[in-house]
Amino acid sequence: MAEYTKLVEPKVANKEPDSARQEKGGVQYGTVKSDKYFSTTCNREKPFNILLPANYDPNKKYPVMYIMHGYYENQDRMIIKGNGTMYTRQIIGNAIAEGEAEEMICVFPYIYSSATQKDCSGMDDNNNRAYDNFINDLTKDLMPYIEKNYSVKTGRDNTAITGFSMGGRESLLIGMQRPDLFGYIGAICPAPGVTGDFKWKSGEEPHLLFMTAGSNDEVVYSTPNGYHDSFTKNGVPHIWHYVNGGYHGDNSIHAHIYNFVRAAFKA
């Protein structure tokens, strides 16, 4: 973990160049598809979006990255519409076309996972628990569906997870509880609520922990800094990506995606 973190760190860009968000002539971009699966955790069908790489070949296996939204949001937030147009498809497509990122499949789930109600009804402990319950929906229902219906590689070396705000909190929680499944863990402006010793057992460390924060975040404020300090105090190697002018929204997300997809699946 420490060795790979040292390799990644000098390559991290504070922000993505404008060209990363543009569709370029001669470049083929991935296809966004909407799908759904039955969640035994929630006892209902749940939607997700999936980004398949250009020229997706069902006879070829691809690594997979799960990218999660924040509070009150849904599966469209990280790929279609955020504060403005999301350029996730272009950022990832350009990185792959430039040979800077592996061809990959990206999954954008709806992470609210209550067994008694479909959507978030407020910012309180009950709804927080529904978001935290996504670890069960993900590992018991969504991941098996993806592995059955799409041509993905399996194992922690081929599986990444990241998320924004509440999705960043869930990414940290899931990554720390299931290091056997996820080798690359990211978080963008993560919400508070992750507690514990902020350590993995020897031999269970992920290849990479990549945390992004925005200097102008007026929602979670210094919460990411607190996580950063805890990881540093406990000697956990990680990337600390502090976006100058980054707010709690699209520009911090784009900067993170630009860097994280370049670092994933290469350790």
For each predicted feature, which ranges?
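Non-catalytic cap/lid and distal C-terminal segments of serine-dependent acyl enzymes
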Residues: M1-A267
